[in-house]
UniProtKB/Swiss-Prot annotation:
It comes from Angiopteris evecta (Mule's foot fern). This is Large ribosomal subunit protein bL36c. Pfam families: Ribosomal_L36. It is found in: Plastid, Chloroplast. The lineage of its organism: Eukaryota, Viridiplantae, Streptophyta, Embryophyta, Tracheophyta. Transmembrane segments: none annotated. NCBIfam families: rpmJ_bact (TIGR01022). The gene is rpl36. Its main location: plastid. Keywords: Chloroplast, Plastid, Ribonucleoprotein, Ribosomal protein. Belongs to the bacterial ribosomal protein bL36 family. GO terms for molecular function: structural constituent of ribosome.
Length: 37
């Protein structure tokens, strides 16, 4: 999980979701997991 100021989709499989007022990226590739800090 990478915590970043700006999150964006890295590949086509990345999905942008909102969880507890946080924007997160979930993907089939575990390296692409991100969360907005």
């Amino acid at each position: 999980m990478k915590i970043r100021a700006s999150v964006r989709k890295i590949c086509e499989k990345c999905r942008l979701i909102r969880r507890r007022r946080r924007i997160m990226i979930i993907c089939l590739n575990p390296k692409h997991k991100q969360r907005q800090g």
